[in-house]
């Protein structure tokens, strides 16, 4: 007798006639007049539940089997047989059903069989993985995570764990969560009346990181090709479907690379990940296509078969100004493109993923390489049909004098970035990288529109439960 995951059963790892045990939770119970119960049991290893055919001859049939409700946990043993029904290939002719956990009150169980709105499920985030939609999201999220690591490993990258606690603001935006052990009820003060951070844990101000990029650059300038994959934090007071206070970022960094190199890397990585989902998680993708967004499978298949278009920011602005469409946000050179502009370019003009390059320097970060025109930087965004921006990146400024001028221009302290400047003083090299918001990627793949529903426990303004 083997302990089997339901996914392995449906993959054909066990021949008909094999005695197996599956462990999981009851999704539904249906009783027939012939004295047989049909239990749909799932274990999360795949989308489908397996049907157990349970005869009334079992010793605990009346006392336990007939009392099973959605959410009860069971171990079901039996002989695997080909299913006569059209719903699935196999079912289990049960010879034993062991109840390992009851639902206290089926009438108040939040995950009972009836359908719930996805908004309601956020209020019961500790139980929502038991639903079809969140379970499917979790498996696709895992598939994408594994694909990212495989892609970079196969391409010679080294995974670097960058710090979560930092003293530097990568984006220069100041929207950071402070980390402190000071007594908030009795803050130490300097003679000038300001908070005395010399007495804090690190002896200075410290924050949760907004990006691993700057730290990642230090390793790229020694190991050539690295990537980071971890949590990042933004204290933006944005209550939208596109923003989280805590989210995950994928950030590769490549020495001796320019903007075109990382645009190609971004295209290869996205196509690799989407192919992995289409090959490994088609059961979940069919659910998303049926219940969430009918275009998700076609969209991914179209994406992986398309060549990325490329356009300069200046030309993109001209396209938008001359397209005859009225946008909510008027288009002029120097603005940061809004989602409506990005989606028009990807969905209506190019009808393909598009890389927009060479943005005005005044709307981009200090570390992006200044172009020869003195007005733009070697920055890029990858825009995807259906969502807009999915990746942002740049060639980094490797010239110390230009970097210093940019820091000064943006009123940032050179002293705060002394270690970052050292990279330009000791064997500087051209290098480039990008950032991919992982939840935005999961949202794009699944069609689930709000990124609070594609991370296990969302953190957002006024929301830090569980």
UniProtKB/Swiss-Prot annotation:
Cellular component annotations (GO), alphabetically ordered: cytoplasm
Signal peptide: none
Enzymatic class: ligase
Domain of life according to the entry: Bacteria
Any matching Pfam family: tRNA-synt_2
A molecular function GO annotation: asparagine-tRNA ligase activity
Location(s) in or outside the cell: Cytoplasm
Enzyme Commission code: 6.1.1.22
Protein family membership: Belongs to the class-II aminoacyl-tRNA synthetase family.
Quaternary organization: Homodimer.
The protein's name in its UniProt record: Asparagine--tRNA ligase
Gene: asnS
